[in-house]
Amino acid sequence: MDLSILIPARNEIFLKNTIEDALKNIEANTEIIAVLDEAWAEPRVSQHERVTVIKTPKAIGQRAATNLACKLAKGKYVMKLDAHCSFDKGFDRKMLEFFKEVGDNVTGVPIMRNLWAFDWKCYKCGWKKYQGPTPTCPNCGPEKAHRMHRKMMWVGKHNPQSTSFCFDSEPHFQYFEDWKHREPYLTDKKTKGYTETMSLQGSCFMITRENYWKWEVCDEKAGSWGGQGMEVALATWLSGGQVLVNHKSWYGHMFRTQGQDFSFPYPQSGREVKKTKDYIRNKFWKNQHPTQIHKVSWLLEKFWPIRGWTEKQLQDLKSVGS
């Protein structure tokens, strides 16, 4: 087995679509392991020889669910994916070829597109609205709510194509547009077809199964959910690895940031979010990661300047542990 795709899922209505799209587009010796975190999938995932579905009796969280899937994985490489993604044709083969080129001391991702999963459509008058929380038709009103349904689209949109990410001093995820206009990004994109990124968004990453465990990229003590892109990138870079984006493939990710019934599947209290950020900051800022050989200041200097960081904050970090 070359690649194991790990999909943690809790109340994910597009898990079936995600798995079916992956199966349609894989071209390598790839398996899919989905962990249903307490709740059964609805609609149900169809049986397939390449797909393993596990259900936990109670919710264990996204990190623990991903780790459970990785314990069962048979592939040399593992790819963690959110349960609402679409895929480039041959994305698994292209990523495996990418690792053959760059080596295994890497965490890699394809280009991230935005997934246009569905439109809302009123099947009485034909009114449509782009994906989001369940709307009320302005023409027919709430009394015709039963005529409002999702019309599936499942398109990885061509814009934006996200390839550069960072985090600020909080730490909080940010897109890193400035980096895309500097060297070595410009030359690497043109001559190599892949580029370095300071951090990750977190909906997808690929790594050897050995490094997944060795670099401790999915620490359950960080909390059930959130901050995973930063955690994976920090664990990789500060352990002596590289975080690279392969520009020869892509995946589409559906963003759910509008609340109501179009929000995150795990509880997201401000207290829990802060707890995760504090844990990540204390672990990496204070050089507590078990395989850490670089300070966070080393990573900042590599990508400096970075929006959301001041020169004083950088100098303060450089003095930690010295």
Task: List each model region and its residues.
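Short beta-strand/loop segment that forms part of the nucleotide-sugar
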Residues: A28-W40, T52-T56
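A short, conserved alpha-helix in the catalytic core of glycosyltransferases
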Residues: M95-L96, C204-F205, E210-E216, A222-S249
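A recurrent flexible, glycine/aromatic-enriched loop bordering the glycosyltransferase active site
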Residues: R63, H181-M206
